[in-house]
Amino acid sequence: MKPPRRWMYGRGGGKGKPAGLLLLGVFLCLSVVLLLLLHGSSPSLEGEGRKPEAVEAAGGGGEEEEVAVARAEVEEAPLPPGNARLAFLFIARNRLPLDLVWDAFFRGDKEGRFSIFVHSRPGFVLTRATTRSGFFYNRQVNNSVQVDWGEASMIEAERVLLAHALKDPLNERFVFVSDSCVPLYNFNYTYDYIMSSSTSFVDSFADTKAGRYNPRMDPIIPVENWRKGSQWAVLTRKHAEVVVEDEEVLPEFQKHCRRRPLPEFWRDWDRPIPAEAWKAHNCIPDEHYVQTLLAQHGLEEELTRRSVTHSAWDLSSSKDRERRGWHPVTYKISDATPALVKSIKDIDNIYYETENRKEWCTSNGKPAPCFLFARKFTRAAGLKLLDLSLIAANGASTM
C-alpha cells in the first residue's frame, strides 16, 4: 500500500530525499501561508493601537470626525515604557544665549525625563556652530513662523511648539521658556515640583483694564471669559491639546487682538503721543490667548492660576532705556548677585489686585517657593549666576 500522497510531496524522480527534509518543507510552506494571513488581518504600523471601531469611524467623515479619531487614538494608545517627561518649549529669536546655563541644568537628569523643542526664526538651525550645548543640536522645529512681538504670530509659534511636542506620548507637561530665562533650581527639584501637581500652571486673572478687550470678539469670546496673564505657562497634556485643536478663539485674536501702535520705548518720548494711538485697543495676544481659551472651555478649575516664571515689572524709577517701555527688567551682570536670587526664591505668594486674590504657593501639598524660573537675564548675568552655583545647581541640595 502506497503511503499517503502528502508524505510524498517534493520527492520527485525516484531518488527520494529523507523524510525529515520533506516535513521541514511542509512546515515552512504552512508558516509562510500563516504569516500572510496574519499580516492581512492585522493593523498597519501607522494604525497600531487603534481600536477597530475607531478605524471604521475614520472613513467617510469630515474634519470634525478626523479630529475626534485623532483624540481617541491619543487617549487609547498605551504609553510606551519610560518616564513621564517635561517638554521644554524654547521661544528664541536666533541663538540661545543661555545655552550653557541650560546645559548644566539638563545634565542633572540621568533618567531621560525631558525633551527639548526650539522655535527660532525660519531657516535657523542649531548646530555646533550655533550652540555650545549638545542638548540643543537639531532641536529646532522645521515649520517655524516669523514672530513679531505683540502680534498673533507669537501664539502661532506656541501652537507650533505644542504640536511637535505632543507627538511624543511620554511628554506630559509642556513648559514654555524664553531665550532670556534661567532655571533657579536643579532638574530633580523642578521635575518633582511640576509633576507633583495634576494642574497646569497658568498666570490668569480677570482683566478689567479698559481698552484691552475688543467688543467685536463678542459673542464668540464674551467679556466674562476675558483673561490676562504671563505667556510663560506650564500645561498638562490635556490643556496642550486644547490649544493645538483650537479653531474658534485663535481667529478672533488674529482679527481683533492687536497691540496699540506706540513706539517700543514710548515712555521716554519728549513729544506728545498721537491721539489716535491712545484710542486703539491695546491687546497683546500672548498675554491673553491661553488664559482666555481655557476659560472659554470651562477649565479654570484645572489650573493653578499663577506662573512659575518670575519677571520684574516695576519700571517706575528706572532710567535705563532697556528697562522701560513694553518689557520687564533685564538683569545685567552687575545685577547678578546672591541677594537677587534669594529675593526671587523667597517669594511664597502672589496677589492679584483685580480679583482681590492672594495665591499661596505650594508643591505636593506643602508651602513652596512660587518660581522655578526667572527672566530676563543677559548671557553674562546668567553665566555669572552659574559660576556662583546660584542657579541650576546639581549638588545634594535642591534649594
Swiss-Prot record:
Keywords: Cell wall biogenesis/degradation, Cellulose biosynthesis, Glycoprotein, Glycosyltransferase, Membrane, Signal-anchor, Transferase, Transmembrane, Transmembrane helix. One of its GO terms (biological process) is cellulose biosynthetic process. It is a single-pass type II membrane protein. Pfam families: Branch (PF02485). GO terms for molecular function: glycosyltransferase activity. GO terms for cellular component: Golgi membrane. Residues 39-399 are lumenal. This is Glycosyltransferase BC10. Belongs to the glycosyltransferase 14 family. It comes from Oryza sativa subsp. japonica. Disruption phenotype: Retarded growth and reduced mechanical strength (brittleness) due to reduced cell wall thickness in sclerenchyma and bundle sheath fiber cells. Its EC number is 2.4.-.-. Glycosyltransferase required for the regulation of cellulose biosynthesis in the cell wall. Required for the biosynthesis of hexoses (glucose, mannose and galactose) in both cellulosic and non-cellulosic (pectins and hemicelluloses) components of cell walls. Required for the formation of arabinogalactan proteins which contribute to the strengthening of cell walls. Possesses low glycosyltransferase activity. Residues 1-17 are cytoplasmic. The chain crosses the membrane at residues 18-38. Expressed in roots, culms, leaves and panicles. Expressed in vascular bundles of leaf sheaths and stems where sclerenchyma cells are developing. Expressed in mechanical tissues of young organs, such as young leaf sheaths, stems and tiller buds. Glycans are attached at residues 142, 188. It comes from the Eukaryota. It is found in: Membrane. InterPro entries: BC10-like, Glyco_trans_14. Its main location: membrane.
